[in-house]
């Protein structure tokens, strides 16, 4: 099979358009997007440093793409060209380049079959959970305890000059263990905010009014026009270490649900690790239920 390796951020418009066609076709076929947000950004941002391997058919038409970032990759094949070995070819290639985790969004039958054929094992599961209807309205009810107030980022700038530094502090306390979300600095935060969907009014902070410090935050996301039926998302929620074990985690979630429901969201989704049983129980109690599963497959470790 023929393949070209490039960065699509600097590739020709024709190649980028062809990849966009493949992504759209796969989304229609599978019911979920084949690439995550970070890998979608990597298609357009050269500074992200992603490498793209494009496999071609006998007529030199690109029919599949593997996006690679460090030891992680995501692979998509045009539905019209599946079950012809292109996906397996791309996965073998990225694994040969040091990739240890290949994402399968939706984890459909095709992905399971390829993983089995290549003797890859599931190493991580990321669930999408959703709440809608009456349960959303119920869980969006908000009572802020005495001594705290809720401010959106655009409001917080006026009363808390170092709000961004406090945001980073709480984020890094909350996600010290997390490979992607932890250890952020100002540049990483600026990069995360550099998206078309970012709104300062959608980042909510729980403020300890006596200390004028951030106790926690809830960064929400809109997947389009909420009034037109687009999903809202519990994007990132973080609680500072000094405020743990005080029952504030539930409040932080409700802050975002309250905001999104007020903004006319009909459904709110979130992502949670499949093995995080305590978080899943908390989300179950708020009416969330599993709607999608995303997994990573990895080469079997030798023992």
UniProtKB/Swiss-Prot annotation:
Taxonomic path: Bacteria, Bacillati, Actinomycetota, Actinomycetes, Mycobacteriales
Quaternary structure, from the entry: Monomer.
SUPFAM superfamilies: Acyl-CoA N-acyltransferases (Nat)
InterPro entries xrefs: Acyl_CoA_acyltransferase, GNAT_dom, MshD_Acetyltransferase, Mycothiol_AcTrfase
Family: Belongs to the acetyltransferase family. MshD subfamily.
Coiled-coil residue spans: none
Binding-site residues, acetyl-CoA 2: 237-239, 244-250, 276-281
N-acetyltransferase domain boundaries: 6-134, 154-303
Binding, acetyl-CoA 1: 75-77, 83-88
Catalytic activity: 1D-myo-inositol 2-(L-cysteinylamino)-2-deoxy-alpha-D-glucopyranoside + acetyl-CoA = mycothiol + CoA + H(+)
Protein name (Swiss-Prot/TrEMBL): Mycothiol acetyltransferase
UniProt KW keywords: Acyltransferase, Repeat, Transferase
One example of a Gene Ontology biological process annotation: mycothiol biosynthetic process
Pfam families per record: Acetyltransf_1, Acetyltransf_7
Record keyword Repeat present: yes
Purpose: Catalyzes the transfer of acetyl from acetyl-CoA to desacetylmycothiol (Cys-GlcN-Ins) to form mycothiol.
Classification via HAMAP family: MshD (MF_01698)
Annotated positions binding 1D-myo-inositol 2-(L-cysteinylamino)-2-deoxy-alpha-D-glucopyranoside: 37, 180, 221, 233, 271
Enzyme Commission no: 2.3.1.189
Gene Ontology molecular function: mycothiol synthase activity; protein-N-terminal-alanine acetyltransferase activity
């Amino acid at each position: 099979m023929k393949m070209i390796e490039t960065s699509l951020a600097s590739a020709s418009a024709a190649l980028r358009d062809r990849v966009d066609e493949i992504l759209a076709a796969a989304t229609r076929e599978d019911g979920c997007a084949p690439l995550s947000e970070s890998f979608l950004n990597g298609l357009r941002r050269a500074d992200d440093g992603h490498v793209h391997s494009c496999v071609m058919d006998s007529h030199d038409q690109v029919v599949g793409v593997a996006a690679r970032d460090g030891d992680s990759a995501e692979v998509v094949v045009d539905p019209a060209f599946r079950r012809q070995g292109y996906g397996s070819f791309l996965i073998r290639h990225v694994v040969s380049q040091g990739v240890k985790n290949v994402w399968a969004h939706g984890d459909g039958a095709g992905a399971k079959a390829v993983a089995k054929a290549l003797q890859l094992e599931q190493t991580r599961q990321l669930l999408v959970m959703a709440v809608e209807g009456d349960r959303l309205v119920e869980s969006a009810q908000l009572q802020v305890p005495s001594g705290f107030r809720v401010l959106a980022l655009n409001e917080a700038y006026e009363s808390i000059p170092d709000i961004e530094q406090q945001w980073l502090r709480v984020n890094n306390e909350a996600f010290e263990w997390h490979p992607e979300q932890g250890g952020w600095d100002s540049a990483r935060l600026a990069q995360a905010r550099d998206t078309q969907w970012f709104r300062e009014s959608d980042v909510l902070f729980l403020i300890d009014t006596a200390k004028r410090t951030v106790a926690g935050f809830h960064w929400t996301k809109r997947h389009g026009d909420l009034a037109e039926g687009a999903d809202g998302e519990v994007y990132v929620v973080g609680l500072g270490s000094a405020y743990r074990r005080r029952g504030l985690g539930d409040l932080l979630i409700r802050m975002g649900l309250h905001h999104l429901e007020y903004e006319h969201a009909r459904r709110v989704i979130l992502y949670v690790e499949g093995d995080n049983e305590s978080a899943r129980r908390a989300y179950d109690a708020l009416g969330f239920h599993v709607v999608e599963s995303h997994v990573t497959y990895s080469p079997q470790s030798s023992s």
